[in-house]
Amino acid sequence: MAQHFSLAACDVVGFDLDHTLCCYNLPESARLIYNSFAQFLVKEKGYDKGLLTVTPEDWDFCCKGLALDLEDGNFIKLADNGTVLRASHGTKMLSAEALAEEFGRKEWKHFMPDTGMAFRSGKYYFYDNYFDLPGALLCARVVDSLTKQNNGQKPFDFWKDIVAGIQHNYKMSAFKENCGIYFPEIKRDPGKYLHTCPESVKKWLRQLKNAGKILMLITSSHSDYCRLLCQYILGNDFEDLFDIVITNALKPGFFSHLPSQRPFRTLENDEEREALPFLDKPGWYSQGNAVHLYELLKKMTGKPEPKVVYFGDSMHSDIFPACHYSNWETVLILEELRGDKDGKPEESEPEEKKGKYEGSKAKPLNTSSKKWGSFFIDSVSGLENREDSLVYTWSCKRISAYSTIAIPSIEAIAELPLDYKFTRFSSNNSKTAGYYPNPPLVLSNAGKLTAK
């Protein structure tokens, strides 16, 4: 595999929408998402009213890369080899002694190397993006409440109520019906929750299109919500930017399902209509699958194997499936890179090659957590004073395994030439090679870590 990656070499450029092209005001959107679920649990399911009150300190619990064991109410931070680095019961962190007693040095009971372990199952749930994180705090506080009520009795059975809350607030008809709290509030005051795309990003999208690239938008958001977001962040003519728009894509199934399991559907007034046996032309569609999409891309490019790159923020929904099932190049939007503005590792890109990188912007909500430590590395419990006790997290391992490159935002690369050569993640390069503009400082400063 080539050591470098360039957008100029790609025929097709695809984008996720939420937290990729569309950037949210995270403190405000997090509160809104939390409240939409908490209100439902309290008013519809009879949960403790204390869930409705959240202090600023409570948000420190939120950290990407955690797994929730749905039966015992434990949140888990995994090392790259599947052992448990930190854990909490609800919001209560386990001590080193309790951690050793509960988990030892063995693999977490649900761990299977990479492709064998789904992000979501009936037994656990991984939190890997900023849309999910408020739910992690809510679930942890639910566990606290139920533990107090039931004297610690397990297993827990609250997940069905969380799923009901998702359905209530985000079902396909919720936007049109003004159902729940989330959509009505976004419609009422989009500027409170959404950031418009910088002019540099809009110009970059047009530059890609003018260079002959096919541009795609593939989002699991429904068409009506997608339209509201895109009109606000890109303008009313946003459809002119994209050759193909796919909403309600139901990722990751979009990439993993067979065409017969997930056909494309036409849309009429934001309502899904007939299932299509194949795609014969560009346009706006709902649901679908990567196989039929790729056949259309072959037709549009006139190439037997058009090269596709896909930008997304979720390892579960975007990066892993696009890489693993479709063999696309993948660009991970990793907000955690925005916090690294106070120093430059030795292997950082030369200043004159850098795109516009807004390091001075306010740090996103909880890119680091006092409770959970770094998203990228951690020390093995009980060995904190030993230099070689630092290990990669499971989340960090997956970044280098399934991402072509990782960037803090699209804006960070929007002013680079399209033929700019990014150093890619690969087995031949260091684990920090694919981070742009710099590797996370915590990785650069850690030296040689223990890789399991």
Curated annotation (Swiss-Prot):
SUPFAM superfamilies: HAD-like. Mg(2+) binds at residues 16, 18, 313. Keywords: Acetylation, Hydrolase, Magnesium, Metal-binding. InterPro entries: HAD-like_sf, HAD-SF_hydro_IG_5-nucl, HAD_sf. Pfam families: 5_nucleotid. The active site is at 16 (nucleophile), 18 (proton donor). Its EC number is 3.1.3.-. Coiled coil: none annotated. This is 5'-nucleotidase domain-containing protein 1. It comes from Bos taurus.
